[in-house]
């Protein structure tokens, strides 16, 4: 059996996810079993149009050129993995509700650029994604678990419980109930070991909403409302890393429209 061919690809992002991966000494242990055939951040001579067994994609789709790139990656890869908040949820750059033209003008002014811009969107908007690695940046253990599982021919399990569970297991005081801060732990996918609450900081939801339709934004919005937050403040808070989750505005609106008292 030959080596597993792996490719790392970057779209619109801060490159923090790739940097996190590049700094992992454990990658050297892959050499006997895997071949990295594309990683432009590490090797500028990398060719993106290569057949691979596993493709790891970082960043949100923000240009027409990137739409074509992810489609080509999907054609070439047996398994596609979205890595990090930008690739999985669209990232903080997809948070704003302002018109694209206004945002473009603010960033680039009158400068001419060679690419065609579009609103930042998750990779799954354009191609089938087989597995997600969450976080901003992702946890090293999550990447190693996923990759190691793929290499032995199995499939990694997804995380389906909230940050609150890890918070309780670690014995942290509840940021939401005890400090009264707008913590998103109840609706955010776990896996970070409740790092921010562990330091007394409210979760901002960088790992995205829990899957399987169990992210109850409405229940949390009710708590936020009781603490004096406006509808706009709640939506802004919840959409920071969930800009493309249609449930947010619908569920928050239900609380403020009298749908739930």
From Swiss-Prot:
Protein name: Sulfhydrogenase 1 subunit delta
Lineage of the species this protein comes from: Archaea, Methanobacteriati, Methanobacteriota, Thermococci, Thermococcales
Binding site for [4Fe-4S] cluster 2: 164, 167, 174, 183
Enzyme class: oxidoreductase
Gene3D superfamilies in the cross-refs: NADH:ubiquinone oxidoreductase-like, 20kDa subunit
Gene Ontology annotations for the cellular component aspect, listed alphabetically: cytoplasm
Catalytic activity line of the entry: H2 + NADP(+) = NADPH + H(+)
Record bears the keyword NADP: yes
This protein's UniProt keywords: 3Fe-4S, 4Fe-4S, Cytoplasm, Iron, Iron-sulfur, Metal-binding, NADP, Nickel, Oxidoreductase
Thermal dependence of function as given in the entry: Optimum temperature is greater than 95 degrees Celsius for hydrogenase activity. Stable up to 100 degrees Celsius. Loses 50% of activity at 80 degrees Celsius after 21 hour incubation.
Complex formation: Heterotetramer of alpha, beta, gamma and delta subunits. The nickel-containing alpha and delta subunits constitute the hydrogenase activity. The beta and gamma subunits (flavin-containing dimer) constitute the sulfur reductase activity.
Binding site for [3Fe-4S] cluster: 192, 196, 203, 206
Subcellular location: Cytoplasm
Cofactor requirement: Ni(2+); [4Fe-4S] cluster; [3Fe-4S] cluster
